[in-house]
Amino acid sequence: AAIEKRALRVQVNAAESVLPGQTLEVKVNAGQKARVQLFAVDEGVLQLTGYRTPDPLSDLLSNRALDVTTRQAMDLLMPTHERLLGRIPHFGGGMDAEGGRFLNPFRRKSEPPFAYWSDPVQAADGTASFSIPVPEYFSGKMRVMAVASSEQGSLAAGSAQSLATVRGTLIIKPQLPLVAAPGDEFDGAIVVANTVKGSGENAQVEVAVQLPEGLELVSGKLAQTLRVAEGKEAVIPFTVIAKEVLGDAPVRVTAKIAGSDKPVTRTQSLSIRPLGAMRRTETAQPLALAAVPQAKGSYALDAPRSLYPYQARTELAVSPARVLAIRSLLDKLDSYQYGCTEQSISRAIPYVVLWDAPELRDKLGLGEPKARFAERAKEAIGRAVSAIRASSSGGSVTLWPGRWGSETAFVTAYAGDFLVLMHEHGLAVPEGLAGSILQELEHAVARTPANLVDARYKAYAAWVLQRDGRIMTGAFNTIESWFQRNARNWEKDVVSALFADGFSRLRLSKRASERMPASMQGTTDPYLSSGMARAIYALTLKQTGLAKQSDEQLQASLLDAAFSQNATTIDEAMATRALVELAQADAARADSFAISCAAGADSSGIAIREGMMNALSAPGCTRFAVKGEGSTDGLWTHLVQQGYDRGPVTVSSNGMEVSRKYLNTQGQLVQNARLGDMVTVQVCARVPGETVPNAVITDMLPGGLEAVLEKDGGVPAADGLSRFERREDRVIFFAELKPEERCFSYKARATSRGTFSLPAVQAEDMYRPAVNATAGAGRLQVK
């Protein structure tokens, strides 16, 4: 009885049927002054998720049944299945996160499941009106749900629902592939079904198809009048070819009964995308070597790639080597797409070391506007701190949240180094986070090293802790003794430089000088690598003042490591950190040289003069001209091209190999398939001479094929495969690659007739993007 007093008698009044593309008018009556909110969702989606119309009163008063106040929480800690069923829907989405970067940037406009919700409406007289726009593509039943609550102070609530059927007079079903590449020729069709009551056996239907700029008609008629009997359907076939107009290609279809003034429209899109993925290439060379001399004081430099204009970047910079290197590395780190803890930290390190160096930022061209640099810096540093916090557990920091591995010891030390570096450069550090990580490093340093790699990590951690102001004399002595007993030639290892800096901070100058090596030997560690070792060596030399090598020698060593094919994001970040320490006034000046585009670009481009760097950004430029009267000594050029290549896929192998096969149901290699056939796509990759623990393979599907989910919806089984993701037009494998070939496969179905160019399959080391391979080329015919 008490519940009955608090129940609002909500009523939903709506038409039982509505046409696609029209508006459904709904009136909600709550019986008294109330706040009302309306929802309308595709009934098929609600049945799929088992969603029940909300019952607010039952939820609000369930704990007051029988006048008993419940204070136990066990049913919330371990809720029953019945309690959860219908309360928590099956969630999706998440594509705005890092993984969303693997989506097709030229994706078509899809037809999302129908869902509508209103803002809460104040119904002063107890009634509220709503207008629900129905998409032109929607056909089926929708559930209209209303929830209402009384004014504050008197608890009363209620809900109601109604079903409405959406059905058109004519049903249009375009049949098109999801994606195509420029040059693909394929068949399309428009199916028109006549559901107009009383139209008869001889109903005449006028159909018009409007093609977008990116599609050109090869055969067929786009405007026809068809005889479509009531309850029957007819097909309009046509053949089109995709042009070099990238992006969403909407095909619009209009149909109406002859003589009617109420046409039905339907739009379906396909994606026209290039055959290859976005690729960035860059070269850095002395101006005298990179450019071809022309007239006196004039040089020409060619840009080798022909790119589509979408997101294209072609930029040439002329600058002293050190300035150019820091700008280039900062730009390169900003462009990396993976969001693991290490890469987030590496991306932020240059911003930390430049934070309190306004004069150097002016030389680099990063001084103006100041607010822009601060915004970029805060974004990068904030992301790094968030990544550390998300991956931190008990003071240890993992590469990915929840993924423990042999690299965890290094990542924890690297995170501690980053947080201490923030403090050294005057940035606020989260005390609780830093405290737990540094405490874990203290525990790690106190343990006996398990092997050479572990000993290096402990020496690195001790160096980080000492910079935080902790007394690490005993730790340095213990780790040094371990190396003396267990390692050969360790005096030229990076740990010697760490020991030297540690002893120098302890005012043990003689011991520091003895320990600092005159040169640095490399390591095979993928994390504390040769590139990071060189950067630490340069940093410790500058900090101790022990002039074992000149700045020019250190600079050359850092540039070799940072711009080598095997450079990791750690190498690039640490090299930038060391180069900032080395940066000083350069004699060479670039502002006496003018850069212009000599061929290829539609415009003259954008000239950039920032600090000691002179650059020209001219997308589409194929040849640059550099003119000036000054000396070229000490000046370098940096050419960056980023974008999507025109033409067929360029096969390449840079320290990695990848291949792809299409197999029929008998396991035979095929280049043709019939409509409806199931095809197995097999992608194989290897890395000669080494193991890559974190590789990503992206296989783009040709138009005419669509990926098929495994029966159990799971991941295809394969050695080394750690993660598999499926997109509309591509699949992504995250795997460990070895010298022995490893193969991964998935199923695809032939869904559209035509001749389709084969897009790229690309493999790369996630942390050394220069180690990569691309395969593709050829054509697939679907009959």
Where are these regions (language model features)?
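C-terminal segments of large proteins
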Residues: 1-783
